[in-house]
Design a protein with these regions (language model features):
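Helical segment within the ABC ATPase nucleotide-binding domain
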Residues: 72-84
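Conserved catalytic motifs of ABC-family nucleotide-binding domains
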Residues: 53
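Conserved ABC ATPase signature
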Residues: 32-36
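Catalytic Walker B motif of ABC-type/P-loop ATPase nucleotide-binding domains
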Residues: 57-61
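Hydrophobic anchor residue at the start of the ABC signature
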Residues: 46
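Conserved ABC ATPase "signature" region
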Residues: 1-28
């Protein structure tokens, strides 16, 4: 309710209920955040971030604390957001978790962007995102585009 009021949302209740059901939080509707486990708090934060139907959304380590079912569901959400035209930015150390989802990645090294990698430029390159990350961070020059 707080998020809906903060964003002055109208007709949000069905979407709110769908988000809570999608992330298995329906039975937790009456609980306060501090009564939830870390994983449930993470899922609730994701639901709160999605409620205003943003055109751009930033997720910081979104899979930390989530159970495998919730991770699978969150990946579906990422795909749906992308397909709807929403820009999805994900900051993560769990590189393999984003392997099938990324279009553009910014690889950081010592607090700076070391490389910008476009998936479409790698069609003939069979390296994984993790391989590319280690190739760039283990000795490559800063600020190059792949």
């Amino acid at each position: 309710e707080f998020i809906a009021r903060a964003y002055k949302l109208k007709d949000y209740k069905a979407y709110k209920d769908a988000l809570l059901e999608r992330f298995d939080l329906t039975d937790k509707k009456k609980k306060f955040g501090d009564e939830l486990s870390k994983g449930m708090q993470q899922k609730l934060s994701i639901c709160c971030g999605l409620l205003p139907r943003p055109r751009l959304v930033l997720f910081d380590e979104p899979m930390i604390g989530l159970d495998p079912h919730a991770i699978k569901e969150l990946k579906k959400v990422f795909e749906e957001l992308r397909d709807s035209g929403c820009m999805v930015l994900v900051s993560t150390h769990m590189i393999d978790s984003m392997e099938e989802l990324w279009d553009t990645t910014y690889i950081m090294k010592q607090g700076r962007v070391a490389a910008v990698v476009e998936r479409e430029n790698l069609k003939d390159n069979h390296k994984s995102l993790e391989d590319i990350f280690f190739e760039i961070t283990e000795g490559a020059a800063l600020e190059r585009e792949v």
